[in-house]
């Protein structure tokens, strides 16, 4: 049963957003239903955050969090891997692919995962990731549930593409799609913008919104039904990463941690990656732009840099603990952005400078609400080939070079 106009007015009045129905009388039936659906699914309680913007940005006391380094991992590889394989065979591990983005920065109008990195034959980003996951499926002789998070913009294209390619050999019964929730975009007073007469201006709810999006899309029913206890969440733009890596899973389980985070040794103290740390004694990530010179040059007891391990957006979460933090409110990040909007005359304006706020929740806040986290070092040139740009650093070019180095035929 969808929301009625009266219910929508009631909800809007509660948050002082009645203006979004200004053009309701001009809309056709389909558009009316569209805006009512949007009003129903939009979390407006977050708009209160504008009033407390300053409190949200405060960081606590930052101290180092030691990573499990390669030598310790190698010494225990067999044991860790056996534990991880056992968990996979028991159906306790699932993977979540964050694939809501478009390939815009690569000059493509398609979903990011549809980008072709091949040279002599087609090799798509989705294909690279599924191939990597298939290696574990063969190793464990067991299928792993793969949840794919799409967005409003790319959902249909993503599903059609993967079906057309027969999921690159993956068992379709183990692939589940869900859409990332959207958060409203507002002016500086916290009033929601309209992007069309029948459409609120919205943007994805940040990389920390994936679990609540799973929940609201009914995916947790599958998680509970299948007895899934661990979720490995990873981003679409790193074509070399190991997914549902048994050694990583086993190490996290054996160390009794509720989160594992794959990390790489930084290639320079000022490299633009977030760094694992403790904040007020709890696991956290300090973003590269928050690292002071003092932190950047701090040393641990061995004389090594204390904040030396960058995160690569590949995390293993314990489901039970994720559900616990979902009962609490996730902290919000308020980001100033340029937001296209309808002006008083109903004309679309595309601003050249920031004119409002978008609201995001971030993975680092999920980690900070957890009691323990294992930073797990991986070899950079074997597991980290991010594609953020067309050329240069972290680009299609650099990823092709790394794929070739790792024996992938392009």
Show which residues each predicted segment covers.
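Fold-independent oxyanion-binding glycine-rich loops
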Residues: 100, 151-152, 180-181, 216-217, ...
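Catalytic core of tubulin tyrosine ligase-like
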Residues: 227-232, 240-244, 249-409
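Conserved beta-loop-beta/alpha segment of the NTase-like Rossmann-fold superfamily
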Residues: 167, 172-271
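Conserved structured core elements
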Residues: 96, 108, 120-127, 152, ...
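Hydrophobic/aromatic beta-strand patches that form the interior of the parallel beta-sheet core
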Residues: 96, 115, 147, 176-178, ...
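Short acidic, glycine/serine/threonine-rich loops at helix termini
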Residues: 107-110, 157-163, 187-192, 243-247, ...
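N-terminal glycine-rich phosphate-binding loop and ensuing alpha1 helix
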Residues: 5-176, 184, 195-204, 208-211, ...
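N-terminal glycine-rich, Lys/His-bearing helix-loop that initiates the first secondary-structure elements
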Residues: 1-3
